[in-house]
Structures are given as C-alpha cells and as structure tokens.
C-alpha cells in the first residue's frame, strides 16, 4: 500500500539482487549491509538502486570515509543515517556529531548507544 510510509532496508543480500527487485517496489529502498566502502556506495548510486542509506561509521572505515559518503549523498540529494552496529560513548558522540553536519531534510537519524 503506497499510502503507508515504509522503507525497505537492505531487502536482499547483494546489490545485484536488489537491482532485480527494485523496479517492482513502490516504496523506497535503503542500503545498509552492502555498502561497506565508498566504492560500494558509488556503485549503488550509479545503478540507481538506493533511495537512501543506513551508514555505519565503523563499517565504512571511520569518520573520514563517512564524511566522503555523506558528501556523495549531498551531491545526489540522498537521505541517510549516521549509525553504527554497537559501541560506547565515543562512537555515539561520533555519530551524533557527524549527523549534525548533514542537511536536516536528508538526515534519517543518528545512533546513540544504550545499554540493554
């Protein structure tokens, strides 16, 4: 139902699988696990299979690489998050500080670690 706000996050394991599926979906697709580096982000953008991203700072290789993909998303007006898989206060601060540098209309959220 198109009226329900919904995003498919990483609906398949590979970009090739997502490319096959993307044209049949009416909701946006965000990539997460398949974007492990800057080249993967560029590939996803060039294939037109990403409507946004769920970025993990440590998966991308740190803050410098994360700022590069942030800038790529700014050029293409793609939304994204500034997250991580887990961590403590330092990674939470990094995610929040980096998120503060993203244009608000493209910011999908920042991750702050909490103990379970």
Model-derived features with residue positions:
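Shared catalytic-loop signature of beta/alpha-barrel
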Residues: 13-30, 36-116
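Non-cysteine beta-strand/loop elements that form the S-adenosyl-L-methionine
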Residues: 10
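Alpha/beta enzyme core
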Residues: 1-7
């Amino acid at each position: 139902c198109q009226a329900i706000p919904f995003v498919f996050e990483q609906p398949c394991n590979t970009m090739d699988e997502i490319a096959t599926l993307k044209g049949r979906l009416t909701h946006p697709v965000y990539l997460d696990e398949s974007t492990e580096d800057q080249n993967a982000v560029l590939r996803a953008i060039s294939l037109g299979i990403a409507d946004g991203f769920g970025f993990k700072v440590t998966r991308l290789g740190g803050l410098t690489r994360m700022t590069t993909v942030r800038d790529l998303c700014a050029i293409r007006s793609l939304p994204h998050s500034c997250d991580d898989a887990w961590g403590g206060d330092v990674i939470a601060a990094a995610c929040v500080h980096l998120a503060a540098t993203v244009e608000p209309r493209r910011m999908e959220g920042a991750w702050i670690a909490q103990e379970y």
